[in-house]
Regions:
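A shared catalytic/ligand-binding motif for oxyanion handling
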Residues: 1-157
Length: 157
């Protein structure tokens, strides 16, 4: 977990790889998360049938992941921005594709996301995901700046 701030806005980023223990892992970190948390994970599982090139029924693991994400008030940011897109993050040697890498965020924080996209990678069987935020650069007036008092400039005759 990385905690910090971007343009004076708190953010926490959690990276997870836990295909066998999805529910337990999310439950364990629930106390560490808040509305500023972004979870980046490879669960080796899709969340919706649309996330696979081969249309299969939703299995129990998929349903458990979907239920757990809902219980934590999280949202699949990529699916929220691209509800009908058939883009994939993983390609198998069998010629099938799936979106098994996810970026989850709190539902109330969705307005802070500018865009998200899947970027092709030629060096891996997983594509990269890019997330841009709406953090605006804040102009802060430096209170330590010295200023000349203009009354000293009056000429006395």
């Amino acid at each position: 977990m990385i905690k910090g701030s971007i343009q004076e806005e708190d953010i926490a980023i959690i990276s997870i790889y836990a295909p066998q223990y999805i529910r337990q892992t999310l439950t364990d970190i629930k106390g560490e998360t808040d509305s500023s948390t972004i979870i980046v994970e490879d669960f080796n599982i899709t969340i919706t049938p649309m996330d696979r090139s081969s249309k299969q029924k939703i299995n129990k693991k998929t349903q458990v992941l979907d239920d757990t994400v809902d219980e934590m008030d999280l949202i699949d940011i990529c699916r929220a921005f691209h509800p009908n897109a058939e883009e994939y993050t993983f390609s198998s040697a069998h010629g099938t594709f799936s979106r098994i890498d996810h970026i989850l965020g709190h539902k109330s924080n969705l307005s802070k996301i500018k865009k998200i996209k899947i970027v092709s990678s030629i060096f891996s069987d997983h594509n990269t995901m890019r997330l841009d935020t709406n953090c605006k650069k804040k102009t802060v007036r430096n209170t330590n700046t010295w200023r000349l008092n203009n009354t000293f400039l009056k000429q006395v005759y």
